[in-house]
Amino acid sequence: MAEKKTSTRFPYESTEYRRARNRLLQSEIKLRRQIEAVAEQRRKLPLGGVVKTDYVFDSAEPGEGAIKAVRLSELFAPGKRTLFLYNFMFPQAPDMDSPCPTCTSIIDTVDGAARHVTQRVNLAVVAKAPIDRFRQHARNRGWQHALLLSSSGNTFNHDYGAEGENGQQWPLAHVFVRRGKKIHHFWTSELWWAKPEPGQDMRHVDFMWPMWGIFDATPEGRSKSWGPSLSYP
């Protein structure tokens, strides 16, 4: 591979632009280091609590595969000791029966990456809705790869922070790990419960939602008044 340039300039840029861009580059380098430092700290977490219940979910592939019951322990494929699981808000709440547009936007992206992700770790998306409704939503979106689960018959969502006392659903990402015959909770996107910065939302799952990174690279940035929709004109 040819050696990369250590600096660059683009056609017709001003000195003012280059100075500002170089300052920004230093901030981007610091951010890259900080991202890796946080990731390393996360990787070094001790094991969380042992999962005491081998939860039974209804499961389905997005396509035409059969609906079947599957235990949490069965979500770990041979040779893969880690499970990444996303709690999808569907229904959003007892009085909001529709699937969450935000979660839908996230899984629109994750589904495309699922074949890559599952080369190394297990991946599933769980909703409280019955599995036939969840799969129909997946079909409507064109999802093809992410394993779908329904927790309608168990207490997983409530036990792991994704369901409020009134049945409100919350969008959380979780990591579980298998060690021998035991399954441990390892990590959950607890930034969801942290007070957000002024003018921001929680940004607890931005790491799996590249849309916002694209907006962050533009002059428009993120909009305080815009969010994903289930459909557009």
PLM regions and their residue ranges:
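Non-globular targeting/processing and membrane-anchoring segments
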Residues: A2-L83, F88-R115, Q119, H137-R139, ...
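Conserved segment of the thioredoxin-like fold in thiol-based oxidoreductases
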Residues: N122-S152
